[in-house]
């Protein structure tokens, strides 16, 4: 490369790069654009300096060669071709460019515009931001863990409450054992049964959380998709359970101990009077100053078992006792004069229980022409054992025993004959069957169309739930009285086997009216035929509902 070519390169750099950049710098009014132009010009000057440095080295070599050649040849070198002149002019331009570069750098600093950031700096900043985000996520996770810990603490508190309830139940058992030493085994069995019932109730409530329905009547309605509604359902179920427990406590006066009805009732079931009045319930009050081991008994009026099973006010106890005594004496006289007949019950809706828990009682088969629309619905599982045949009871515990009460009854020390005890058992059996049928009437029939208003139960007015609870309490009290009369065995509770009892065949009333059974030639008695057809069609409909299958439309 000769000097001429280098001179052209330098001129092109100056004219095409440096000057336009300088003009753009001077003509721009925007400070940010001026800063960018200054930065661009500074970089171009650096590139020009590299070219000048290369040219400087070439000139040095060329200068020496020219000098030596001139010395050797003795020729004259013109001004334009003199390397020294060219070199000096180049050095002056380089100094000017360096001053311009320094001026551009200082100008960029004066306008206070930050130069563009390198890619390396950007990468580092992004990494720092990512690290900060990770730290934030970790903090959020820690907060979630704290929330879970608080929830666990709440559960522990609930467990502590349950433990306290258990201790209260144990205290009640101790008091009952002091009052009735003969019923220790019954108390233990009943407490175990209460625990089993609690687990069953909890499972039913858990199932009802995912379904639309009340606690006692879970149905197959669509599952709600809103978690908030499910939570509300759980709250409602809890409130209902609390109401149930409160009702049980008010009815049976069990010292506010939930699910302890059987214990107190079995302890009090030995108080049977000659006039067949219900036993008075006792409230066990812990009194350390008492002589009998800290156990005082407060007597209250019994709760009358009425048709609608409503809670009776204590002020009506005298009238109720008188009416109940008169009714029971009349029933005893009627039973002594005539044999007991099965009262035909109307067809009632079945309980919404599982199919494996529903068992039919034995029934007599009658011809289709003699079938009646009255049918006895199945009983719940806890009452599905056959009833006791009173005539077959030969327990030595029922013969001439002097049953004295612990609750200050008026008939303490009276002797009850076996015949009177059998009559009392018959009356109690009748009351138990009536309460069972009444409870089934309150329940929901799953074969009927679903009434959505049925599930809109107001928690502030649990009238139907309270009635069902009263029925349950009355049934439990009757069961305990019957069990005590039978010798202290529990009544189908699941822990002790029930007595081997002979089933009583259900009697059905047959219409022996020849005018109705006989059909004239003119078909004047079509009503009897229509009734039979209706019965058959209803049975077919029920069978179709119970045995419904998926039909392939194709």
Swiss-Prot record:
Residues 118-301, 330-381, 398-428, 483-524 are annotated as: Disordered. Residues 211-225, 265-300 have a biased composition (Polar residues). Residues 167-194, 419-486 form a coiled coil. Residues 122-210, 226-264, 330-374, 419-428, 483-517 have a biased composition (Low complexity). It comes from the Eukaryota. GO terms for biological process: transcription by RNA polymerase II. Keywords: Activator, Coiled coil, Nucleus, Transcription, Transcription regulation. It is found in: Nucleus. GO terms for cellular component: mediator complex. Component of the Mediator complex, a coactivator involved in the regulated transcription of nearly all RNA polymerase II-dependent genes. Mediator functions as a bridge to convey information from gene-specific regulatory proteins to the basal RNA polymerase II transcription machinery. Mediator is recruited to promoters by direct interactions with regulatory proteins and serves as a scaffold for the assembly of a functional preinitiation complex with RNA polymerase II and the general transcription factors. Component of the Mediator complex. Belongs to the Mediator complex subunit 29 family. This is Putative mediator of RNA polymerase II transcription subunit 29. It comes from Dictyostelium discoideum (Social amoeba). The gene is med29.
């Amino acid at each position: 490369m000769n000097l001429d070519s280098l001179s052209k390169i330098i001129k092109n750099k100056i004219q095409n790069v440096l000057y336009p950049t300088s003009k753009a710098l001077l003509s721009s009014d925007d400070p940010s654009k001026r800063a960018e132009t200054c930065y661009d010009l500074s970089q171009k000057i650096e590139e020009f300096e590299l070219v000048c440095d290369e040219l400087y080295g070439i000139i040095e070599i060329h200068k020496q060669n020219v000098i030596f050649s001139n010395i050797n040849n003795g020729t004259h070198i013109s001004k334009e071709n003199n390397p020294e002149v060219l070199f000096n002019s180049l050095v002056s331009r380089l100094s000017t460019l360096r001053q311009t570069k320094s001026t551009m750098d200082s100008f960029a600093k004066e306008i206070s515009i930050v130069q563009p950031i390198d890619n390396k700096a950007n990468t580092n900043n992004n990494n720092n931001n990512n690290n900060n985000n990770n730290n934030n996520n970790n903090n959020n996770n820690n907060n979630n863990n704290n929330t879970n810990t608080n929830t666990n603490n709440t559960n522990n508190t609930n467990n502590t409450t349950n433990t306290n309830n258990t201790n209260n139940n144990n205290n009640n058992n101790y008091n009952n054992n002091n009052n009735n030493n003969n019923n220790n085994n019954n108390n233990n069995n009943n407490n175990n049964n209460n625990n089993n019932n609690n687990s069953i109730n909890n499972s039913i409530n858990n199932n009802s959380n995912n379904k639309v329905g009340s606690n006692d009547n879970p149905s197959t309605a669509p599952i709600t998709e809103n978690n908030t509604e499910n939570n509300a359902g759980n709250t409602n179920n809890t409130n209902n359970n609390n109401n149930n427990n409160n009702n049980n406590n008010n009815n049976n006066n069990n010292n506010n101990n939930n699910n302890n009805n059987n214990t107190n009732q079995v302890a009090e079931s030995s108080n049977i009077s000659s006039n067949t009045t219900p036993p008075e319930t006792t409230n066990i009050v812990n009194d350390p100053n008492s002589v009998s081991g800290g156990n005082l008994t407060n007597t209250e009026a019994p709760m009358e078992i009425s048709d609608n099973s409503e809670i009776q006010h204590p002020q009506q106890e005298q009238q109720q006792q008188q009416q109940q005594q008169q009714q029971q004496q009349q029933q005893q006289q009627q039973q002594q004069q005539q044999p007991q007949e099965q009262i035909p019950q109307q067809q009632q809706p079945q309980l919404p229980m599982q199919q494996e828990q529903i068992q039919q009682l034995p029934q007599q088969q009658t011809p289709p022409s003699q079938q009646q629309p009255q049918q006895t619905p199945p009983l719940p599982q806890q009452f599905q054992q056959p009833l006791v045949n009173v005539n077959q009871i030969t327990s030595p515990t029922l013969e001439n025993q002097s049953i004295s009460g612990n609750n200050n009854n008026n008939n303490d020390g009276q002797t009850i004959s076996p015949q009177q005890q059998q009559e009392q058992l018959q009356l109690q059996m009748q009351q138990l069957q009536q309460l069972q049928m009444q409870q089934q009437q309150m329940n929901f029939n799953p074969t009927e169309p679903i009434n959505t208003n049925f599930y809109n139960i107001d928690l502030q007015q649990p009238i139907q739930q309270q009635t069902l609870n009263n029925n349950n309490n009355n049934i439990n009290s009757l069961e305990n009285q019957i069990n005590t009369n039978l010798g202290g065995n529990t009544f189908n509770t699941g822990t002790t086997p029930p007595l081997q009892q002979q089933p009583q065949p259900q009697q059905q009333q047959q219409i022996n009216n020849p005018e109705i059974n006989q059909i004239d030639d003119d078909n004047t008695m079509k009503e009897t035929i229509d009734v039979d057809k209706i019965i058959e069609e209803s049975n077919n409909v029920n069978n179709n509902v119970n045995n419904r299958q998926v039909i392939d439309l194709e």
